[in-house]
Amino acid sequence: MSVPVVTVTDLYHPPEDPGDNVDLIMGYGLDEVDLRAVILDALDEKRHLVDGGVPGYPGPRDPGIVPVTQLNAVYGHNVPFATSPFTRMRTPYDTMTEVPAFQQAGIDLLLDTLQRSDEKVHVLSFGSARPIAVAYNREPELVAAKVARVHLCGGTSTPTYLEWNVLQDPQAMIRLVSTDLPIALYPCATEESCYAHDRHNTFYRLHDMRWIEGMHPALRRYLGYALGRLTRPDYLRVLDEDLPDEVMEPVYARSHDVWETAVWVSVTGRRIVRRPDGTHRIVRGDDVGPGDVEIRNEQLPCRAWPHESGLYSFEPTDEPTPTSVFVRDDPAEYERAMNEATPALFQSFRPPEPWHGDVRTDDREMTR
């Protein structure tokens, strides 16, 4: 049975963090996911930012309409998408009704998707969480009734380091963590940085991206277009053609920082396992074999409370609680496992053949 999902992502075009372009493939490629909508979470200052962000990916940039359209085309889907407010919330209770209509569309889409769903929906936040907080401020009863869980990817395992997603909108984080909504917390950073490891943050690093070469051709080209920062306007036709080595080789050589995989593993009920032969895979729960050893990727019940900075604190509890926090046992072991399991998962994704941008042979003949 598929899991209804709305993903809220600070995905940009050209990329600000190429991890968002990579991560969105999960929503399309995982069979267990019924992707109902994509809400584009943009911030005006990031749109105009030239320096800063991930090295090698300067701005300016705009909301990721292009990559969502590309994946819709590759998979033959029509997942709706819309942008949300470009400015921060002024207070935790801000409804942001005064922003331009174009920027209202993402909040309207989120609320409409919840309203139309006969099942509770998992809402995944890979950004500021502003669209979710504003939607809750506008329609708290609807959100409470229709959200299965908010999966909040952001924050710090100790409230000392101002993590990037929190910085994008502290008021949004304060609002969500203060509610009684069921929330799964996935801290991105430790007290040191967002590139350090501990048991409660989700970060790991892929040593290179050579594995993209083994992906489905359309998905390989999609990532080449994004991670290679191509400016071609024919962003659908580019998916029909292999990109030159001078574009792809620098992409393959990059390391890649990841925070999002733990969320998708949790939402789908998948497991990270070490097989008896020593290989690592991300598998369905019912595909765990008797000789497999599970690599912990779990949610631990906790109490959580926000701070004025937008960061939060948490403590494990045995009491009933709507809140939980990510936990793993050995971050180094986790990273070793994911350096094998994550590439294998992406290489397993197979969009419909031929991909839906292909022109039929008889049509090609007619154009000659």
Locate the predicted segments by residue:
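Residues in well-ordered beta-strands of folded domains
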Residues: A82, H151, V265
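Metal-dependent C-N hydrolase catalytic cores
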Residues: S2, K46-S117, T317-P322, V327-R368
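Intrinsically disordered, low-complexity boundary segments flanking structured domains
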Residues: I25-M26, V66-L71, E139, P250-V251
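Active-site histidine-anchored catalytic micro-motif
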Residues: S2-D51, P55-D62, T91-N201, R205-L206, ...
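Sec-exported extracytoplasmic/periplasmic mature domains
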Residues: A73, S178-L181, G224-L227
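Conformational coupling and interaction surfaces
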Residues: S2-T7, V22-A37, L167, Y186-R368
